[in-house]
């Protein structure tokens, strides 16, 4: 895992290596962190996994909130717990990624919790930007404009 990560890290300064939240993954994160190679600990499903990743030196911790919810767990609680834990240890600099976002409420909740990053699918982004009252407002503006335009004729 480490040898492959070193090769991929040589591709550019903005490359972050995704490493799974496993015992071997934690060892790799520690080694890569010591070599200043940025890592993203992925497939995180508990605050304990996140803490271990931060202690190992992960640059990013990807908490799969949607998958947790899909399995009947409270994905947001894992994000809240992780952020609370990391707040207790200012020397841990890992950034929390709200991953596997399923709907706009996940985005709102993750932002309120203080997640550093969200991986937002295009479909959710489109849901976030659209609102029925915006559409109604546009129709009203256009109708008002037509009234003004008719008066000028």
Where are these regions (language model features)?
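Active-site entrance/lid segments in N-terminal catalytic domains of soluble metabolic enzymes
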Residues: 1-16
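Catalytic cores of alpha/beta
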Residues: 3-4, 28, 46-56, 102-117
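Alpha-helix-loop-beta-strand connector modules within alpha/beta enzyme cores
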Residues: 9-10, 25-39, 74-96, 139-153
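Catalytic beta/alpha-barrel core
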Residues: 12-23, 38-51, 62-72, 95-100
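Conserved, mostly hydrophobic/aromatic
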Residues: 17, 32, 53, 110, ...
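Glycine-rich phosphate-binding active-site loops on the catalytic face of alpha/beta enzymes
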Residues: 43, 59-72, 113-134
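C-terminal active-site rim and adjoining tail of enzyme catalytic domains
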Residues: 100, 111, 118-122, 132, ...
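Glycine-rich beta-alpha junction loops
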Residues: 100-105, 123-127
């Amino acid at each position: 895992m480490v040898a492959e990560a070193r090769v991929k890290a040589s591709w550019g300064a903005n490359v972050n290596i995704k490493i799974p939240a496993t015992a071997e993954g934690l060892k790799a994160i520690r080694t890569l962190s010591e070599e200043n190679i940025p890592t993203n600990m992925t497939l995180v499903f508990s605050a304990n996994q996140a803490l271990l990743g931060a202690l190992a030196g992960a640059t990013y911790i990807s908490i799969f909130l949607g998958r947790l919810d899909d399995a009947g767990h409270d994905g947001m609680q894992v994000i809240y717990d992780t952020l609370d834990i990391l707040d207790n240890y200012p020397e841990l600099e890992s950034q929390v990624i709200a991953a596997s976002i399923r709907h706009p409420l996940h985005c709102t909740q993750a932002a309120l919790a203080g997640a550093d990053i969200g991986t937002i699918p295009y479909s959710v982004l489109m849901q976030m930007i659209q609102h029925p009252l915006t559409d109604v407002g546009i129709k009203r503006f256009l109708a008002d404009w037509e009234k003004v335009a008719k008066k000028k004729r």
